[in-house]
A protein has these predicted regions:
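Polyanion-binding surfaces on beta-sheet-dominated domains and ring/shell assemblies
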Residues: 1-146
């Protein structure tokens, strides 16, 4: 990124959003599709953070809503002037998940919440990502409904 004049945080974010190419580096063997994780996004955004003299901080907290627990992930982009842009995303912890203990369930919800906070901050569209739309064979055909 050329430094002709000082750019504000929104211009830096726009540069990052325009130049970020986050590949779908993970494979879901069950559904046989590729998807991107928070780690994939972080790996590709780091050089752009360096180029724009920005930093990224991601944090989690647990929110109780009714009898359910949600992980709230916050992604904050900060520049050298300490100007910030912040995005928050939530993921609900499953009540139980086969083969997972409580810590793994929370970790899984944290990963999803972080991914979606990063998606929001960096304008990554996952609507074509099977991880966001896969029903794992539970979809209903139109003729089944009629």
């Amino acid at each position: 990124m050329e430094k002709k004049e000082e750019q504000n945080i929104r211009a830096k974010l726009g540069y990052i959003q325009t130049n970020l190419k986050a590949p779908k580096g993970q494979l879901n063997k069950f559904g046989n599709y590729r998807y991107r994780s928070a780690e994939d996004i972080l790996e590709t955004v780091k050089p752009l953070l360096l180029a724009t003299n920005c930093s990224l901080v991601i944090s989690d907290s647990i929110q109780g809503i009714g009898d359910r627990h949600y992980v709230m992930a916050t992604a904050t982009l900060m520049d050298e002037n300490k100007d910030t842009v912040t995005v928050t995303a939530y993921a609900r912890e499953a009540a139980e998940k086969k083969g997972m203990d409580a810590a793994q369930i929370t970790g899984s919800a944290s990963s999803y919440a972080r991914k979606y906070a990063l998606n929001g901050l960096f304008a990554i569209d996952d609507t074509k990502d099977p991880d966001a739309t896969n029903t794992h064979g539970k979809e209903r055909k139109v003729q089944d409904i009629l």
